[in-house]
Curated annotation (Swiss-Prot):
Known role: Seems to be required for maximal rate of protein biosynthesis. Enhances ribosome dissociation into subunits and stabilizes the binding of the initiator Met-tRNA(I) to 40 S ribosomal subunits.
Protein name: Translation initiation factor 1A
Family note: Belongs to the eIF-1A family.
GO MF entries: RNA binding; translation initiation factor activity
SMART domains membership: eIF1a
The keyword Acyltransferase belongs to this UniProt entry's keyword annotation: no
The keyword Protein biosynthesis belongs to this UniProt entry's keyword annotation: yes
Residue runs in coiled coils: none
Organism: Picrophilus torridus (strain ATCC 700027 / DSM 9790 / JCM 10055 / NBRC 100828 / KAW 2/3)
Pfam family, one: eIF-1a
């Protein structure tokens, strides 16, 4: 059952556009599980890290994340997922990131 394509395949989670999830880059840590995130729609949001992610996944400045904006306050949101550097580079190489947040683009 060897498949040569499995070695080179990287599977990454993408935002669910139907539920309003978008890409974002963490700009600043605000403390108390809060972050300032620049989102792909050009809005800077004050996002929080949900309790189930706090201890499991550490988030730093410059990380690529998936944000779900709040329905009742558009300037706030929740962090859904954090990409590793390898996953972020993969998304950038395959042009899956919007230009506004593609800071992983390697100039060649």
């Amino acid at each position: 059952m060897d498949n040569d394509n499995d070695e080179n395949t990287i599977r990454v989670i993408t935002p669910n556009k139907k539920s309003g999830e978008i890409y974002g880059i963490v700009e600043k840590m605000s403390g108390a599980s809060r972050l300032i995130v620049m989102c792909e729609d050009g809005v800077t949001r004050n996002c929080r890290i949900p309790g189930k992610m706090k201890k499991r996944m550490w988030i730093r400045e410059g990380d690529l994340v998936i944000v779900k904006p709040w329905e009742f306050q558009d300037e706030k949101g929740d962090i859904i997922y954090r990409y590793t550097k390898t996953q972020a580079a993969y998304l950038s190489r395959n042009h899956m990131l919007p230009e506004i947040i593609d800071v992983f683009n390697e100039k060649q």
